[in-house]
Each structure stands twice: as C-alpha cells, then as structure tokens.
Amino acid sequence: MKSLSIYTLTRNQSIEHISKLERQLSGRKFPLKIRTWEWGSMRALAAQLEMYMQEVYSLRFFYSFQIPRLGKEFDLLQIKDNHIVNIELKSGVVSDQAIRKQLIQNRYYLSVLERPIQSYTYISSQNRLVRLTHHDHIVDADWERLCEDLQKEGTNYEGNIEDLFRAELYLISPITDPVRFLKKEYFLTSQQRDIEKKILRDIYAKRSGCFWFSGIPGTGKTLLLYDIAVSYTHLT
C-alpha cells in the first residue's frame, strides 16, 4: 500500500466515491470501507492544516494501515527517512487516558523503524489537537507545531508500507528473551488473542481438563503458551 494525499482525498464531496478513490490513490488490494465519521474527521483535519500551511496537498500519509497478522491499525502515518508523524482521528469525546494508551502502543510498533516519532490525536467534535510528550504525557498541541513536524526536511517513503512492518518483528521468545517477556514488550497477533480468550473461557467454564493448540514453526506458539499462563495467574 502506498502513501496518498489526504488533501486530494477530501476534495471529493461524495462519500460513496471515497472508497474507490482511496483505492486508486493507495493501490490497496481490497476496498476500504470508510465510515462517515472517519471521512468527516479527515476533512476537518485537512481544513485545519490549510489554515496554518500553504502546501497541504504535498503532504503524504499512509491512511488506515493495518499491520498484517497483528491487526494493529494506524489512522495516518507520515513516514520519512529521518522521522515519523502519527495522527489518530477521533470524532467523539475520548479520555486523555485512552488517547495516551493508544499513542504509547502505536509508538512501540513504530519504534522498529528506529526514527524519532511525533504522536498526535485530533478530536474533530471538539476541534482539539493533543500530542504525546517525550515523558508520556498528553498535552494540548498547537497547529503550528504539527505543521512544523509535517514539513520537516526528509524524504518521504514511497514504497509499500507492508514491507516496513512485519509481524515477526514483534514476536519474541520468552525462553531466549525472558527480560522482554517479563516487561511485556511484545504483542500477540489477532489470531493468538482469539485462541487465548477461548482457552481461558474454557478453563473457567470446565475448571479441569486438557486444553491445547497447534501451529506450524515460527507462529508464536511458545509465546502464546507463556502469555496464557501469565494471564491465568493474574486472574486467579
């Protein structure tokens, strides 16, 4: 999937045609279902940027990217050779705690690229822009700073974003890397999370018995087993 111009995408007045246009611009393999509030928030963001900078049309973002297998999604990512800007879009009121949790998690995933990361959230219903500080605090942000971050010198990444983020980069072995495991510096794939939920439900329902799962080598079976053990310990 390629980056696109949100300025170009938000010029279209009909949401019925947005999905088709987005696919043409990004080269996405499958059509993306864009909800009305998402489109509205993106249009509001573009309008705000136009008030503070001249060349909004030149900004390139990866829109609604989801890391394969992990199911982790980002609303807007500007990726350059020397820094990353992440902007999350919200339409309704959301707590600073929830915003902070999401942006910190996003930063962890993005850190594999080993570049400085600037993290923002825009709440369109309040016309509120916030950012995550280097000390992991949520503070109100000004548009001038966001525009400055977006216009920093650097070369836009023009390749497919899937080539930068692979699930195996986030899978660790609790046996060979116990410190990272104990610090929970890992994330399970969506399939692993589903398996864990089912097994824990069965354990609580039946209280005894044998529970198992299988998979080919390299799919994170050991990590899942250890995570289930930790989760069960915490819940009992």
Predicted feature residues:
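N-terminal pre-P-loop "Q-motif" helix
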Residues: 184-203
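Conserved small/polar residues in nucleotide/adenosyl-binding loops
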Residues: 233-236
